[in-house]
Amino acid sequence: MTFLARLFGEKKKTAEIAKNRLSLLIAHERGDGVPKVDFLPALQRELIEVISKYVPVNSDDIKVHLDKQNNYEVLEVNIVLPEQNQGR
């Protein structure tokens, strides 16, 4: 083990998790009187289309959830990416 590896530690597990799963959180303040638009199904379909251009995914691999917390709406998008076997 090299000096730098001992000093900073190995982040192999974290890198694997990040590679296999992408999570995105978006929060915005919702004002009163703004009509609610049900965009989640369309968003999920479009995410599948875009991500499928780069990696093979199906609709079960993408979860979209909208949560309300006080005056904020939190949009959570979880994408499970397929594992890639890389010989190193």
Curated annotation (Swiss-Prot):
It comes from the Bacteria. The keyword Cell division applies. GO terms for biological process: cell division; regulation of division septum assembly. InterPro entries: MinE, MinE_sf. Keywords: Cell cycle, Cell division. The keyword Cell division applies. Belongs to the MinE family. Prevents the cell division inhibition by proteins MinC and MinD at internal division sites while permitting inhibition at polar sites. This ensures cell division at the proper site by restricting the formation of a division septum at the midpoint of the long axis of the cell. This is Cell division topological specificity factor. The lineage of its organism: Bacteria, Pseudomonadati, Pseudomonadota, Betaproteobacteria, Rhodocyclales.
